[in-house]
Structures are given as C-alpha cells and as structure tokens.
Amino acid sequence: MVVRAYEERDLSGMIRVWNEVVTEGVAFPQEELLDETAGAAFFAAQTHTAVAVDEDGHTVLGLYILHPNNVGRCGHICNTSYAVGSERRGQHIGEQLVLDSLKQGKAHGFRVLQFNAVVESNTHARHLYERLGFTQLGVIPGGFRMKDGHYENICPY
C-alpha cells in the first residue's frame, strides 16, 4: 500500500469510498452523496487530498482531505477527514493516512491538527488518535445525528 496525493484517475474510487462512509451515516456529517462532478470539485478544493492505493497504484483503499479548520488567528489549525473502504478496514490503512496527514499538514504550514466531529461510538478512530498522541478535548453532548435519527456525543481531539 502507498499513500500519495490523489490523481484524476483516482476520482471514481475516491467517490466510491467517500459515499460508502456517508451512506453508513455513523462517521461523516455529510448527507449528500458525491457524483463525479461534485466529487472532482470537492476534492480539488481541499488544501491537500491523498489516497491510499494498493501496490499497483490503481485501487483506492482509503483517502483523506486536509484543509484549514478556521481563519486568521486560528488559521494555523487544520482539520482532516479520513475514509477507508469497508472491505479494507482493520488493516492499519487509517493509521497510515493519519501519519501522512500529519506530514502534509506541517508541509502546508499548519501547526495543529484538530478533529472536530469524532463520534463517541467510533471507538476504532478514537483508539487510533489516542495511540498516536492526540488528546480528547471534551465532549459535545448529542452533537452528531446518526443515520437512524438518534444523537450521539462528539469527542473533539
């Protein structure tokens, strides 16, 4: 597996993985699925978008987007979102994406990486972030509406 900046040829695989996570309704705040046009614009608008691809470089296993979390005096803080295809979860792809995003954030002049909306029940992500040295900043009670309509806490890191 290799993590690299995305290329146009990756878009269909990226959209597939992104939409899978959106459809699951338990991790991303987005509700609208991306089509090819919207996906191309969305991923291009990020400060950095990267993919994890298999050794042949053609199959997208996961991805992340990186962008400013705020502006002005807080513009040195970035935010990321990670997505790994369900068939490849549990293979440390997410960890490689997080580690690459830390390097890319620094390369793009950011000093801090903040995760805004980690759903409390997303124990795999929370464990990974804590293992990599991130600290939970608090709890936003009922901050995330799950696909089935109930609300869960958000744990920013």
Residue ranges and their predicted role:
Residues G105-V118:
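Conserved GNAT acetyl-CoA-binding A-motif
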Residues E8, A27-E87, V98-L99, Q104:
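Acetyl-CoA-dependent GNAT
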Residues V2-M14:
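A short beta-loop-alpha structural element at the N-terminal edge
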Residues Y129, F134, Y157:
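Conserved active-site tyrosine of GNAT-family acetyltransferases
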Residues Y82, I140, M146-Y157:
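Terminal substrate-recognition subdomain of acyl/acetyltransferases
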Residues R16-E32:
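Helix-loop element at the rim of GNAT/NAT acetyltransferase active sites that forms part
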